[in-house]
């Protein structure tokens, strides 16, 4: 099935404005790089999502599911097939007592503010993470001593057959930057979070403190995908990179952040290749000096 046929079939599922052809992926990921997606779709209901999945499966069309693109790098050749975006088109939430139920496309920052307003604590660590709930669940996102596994009660998921089911916290198999979602290719639809009653001023104070620490220590004024590398056992990636003498190293439009060596940033005009080449230089130099092979935390996708 060619792209024109795929588009025609998608029009039976989605409205025209929710289907984009040859869509530049740099508009959809935080690194602000990446070639075009053949087709990008934005389903607004679980039924639409189910029908899109049915189409790509039956026709063997390659597909990729993204949130707000804060932890991925799309190569300059772009993405073949269909990109399914679950972001502000899939972001409702509600709060009952000490529990929040939210769709996977909801931004963590938005959820954090809503919980603060309701004087519910436990989510502060995640409130400044630049991503969606779905992405945070998939990788068990964490910061400042907290992880998603600490607050998740249950998650509603969809498999590639369109089956919808619910898993408990234990069944989610949360680990360091992983979960059953990343393991089995499930799609997070929504999650129920368990919080605790707190004090508005104390919650706000902690959130403000964490925000200040991020602003002070992280290069938020440049496009990036957050921490570029996972933490190697017994080490800190940023410290290894700094001690290798790479702080500020620039390769065309990509740079090892001056503020935090664990971040590779786009100075404005970088290509995906610039970033990937710099990542290779970093990994090679750190391995040569310390014998430690860094592993990317950012997901690298697409074609050269």
Swiss-Prot record:
NCBIfam families: murB (TIGR00179), PRK13905.1 (NF010480). InterPro entries: FAD-bd_PCMH, FAD-bd_PCMH-like_sf, FAD-bd_PCMH_sub1, FAD-bd_PCMH_sub2, MurB, MurB_C, MurB_C_sf, Oxid_FAD_bind_N. It comes from Clostridioides difficile (strain 630). This is UDP-N-acetylenolpyruvoylglucosamine reductase. Its cofactor is FAD. The gene is murB. Pathway: Cell wall biogenesis; peptidoglycan biosynthesis. It is found in: Cytoplasm. Belongs to the MurB family.
